[in-house]
């Protein structure tokens, strides 16, 4: 029986805009930003930030060297926020409904302090922080490890007190989904901003039928 549902953030809960992020970083001076940015797993100082190896201030300092001028924290925040297109209300309502139905619902995300600064303020445009929608959040920069490493999935499963076979993992990153499936989780891999509600309902209904049989 499924008891635990883990959601990725970018591309699943919120709609991503990779091109907007590229433009924002170019605007602050990172001319080759497309080479540095990724939609699923960051590298270089971007990956170091999201894996908790460096702080937000370290990132600001390192990026300042890369662009050849002193950047402010606000400029870094604005650039990172370029990844956010919008937060579909349908997703938030579906997540709250899953919790009301008794599922444990958590966030499992490769993210960083700049993104969470925004998400912890007013995630839905109605004054609710992102934590309002989840039972727990497992963030790469706090866990000190990024998906698709097994360790971050283990941290999530321990925190949720759930087995892999009791868990559905929803992520738009194919490598992340493959890693979760290899551990025994049921997985969904929607495209960025795809409506995943019917797909998830089908997985949950299928598992419920299996448990009855």
Which functions belong to the PLM regions below?
Residues 96-99, 157:
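A structural alpha-helix within SAM-dependent methyltransferase catalytic domains
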Residues 28-29, 51, 71, 95, ...:
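Surface-exposed beta-strand edges and their flanking turn/coil or helix-capping segments
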Residues 107:
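Phosphate-binding loop of NTP-binding sites
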Residues 102-104, 185:
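A generic structural motif
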Residues 101-102, 133:
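Structured helix-beta-strand junction loops
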Residues 2-93, 100-101, 112-116:
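N-terminal helical cap/lid subdomain that shapes the substrate entry/recognition surface
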Residues 99-100, 181:
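Anion (oxyanion) recognition and catalysis
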Residues 1-3, 7, 112-113, 117-213:
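Asp-based, Mg2+/Mn2+-dependent phosphohydrolase catalytic module
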């Amino acid at each position: 029986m499924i008891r635990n549902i883990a959601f990725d953030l970018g591309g699943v809960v919120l709609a991503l805009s990779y091109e907007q992020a590229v433009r924002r970083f170019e605007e602050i001076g990172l001319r080759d930003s497309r080479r540095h940015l990724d939609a699923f797993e960051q590298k270089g100082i971007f990956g170091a930030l999201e894996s908790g190896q460096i702080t937000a201030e370290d990132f600001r300092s390192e990026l300042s060297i890369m662009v050849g001028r002193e950047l402010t924290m606000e400029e870094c925040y604005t650039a990172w926020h370029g990844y956010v297109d919008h937060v579909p209300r349908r997703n938030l309502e579906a997540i709250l409904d899953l919790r009301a139905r008794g599922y444990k619902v958590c966030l499992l995300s490769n993210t960083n302090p700049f993104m969470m600064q925004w998400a912890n303020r007013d995630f839905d445009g109605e004054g609710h922080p992102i934590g309002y929608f989840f039972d727990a959040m497992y963030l790469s920069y706090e866990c000190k490890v990024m998906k698709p490493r097994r360790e971050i999935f283990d941290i999530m499963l321990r925190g949720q007190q759930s087995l892999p076979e009791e868990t559905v993992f929803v992520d738009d990153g194919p490598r992340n989904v493959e890693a979760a499936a290899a551990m025994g989780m049921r997985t969904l891999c929607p495209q960025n901003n795809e409506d995943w509600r019917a797909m998830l309902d089908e997985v949950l209904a299928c598992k419920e039928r299996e448990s009855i049989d």
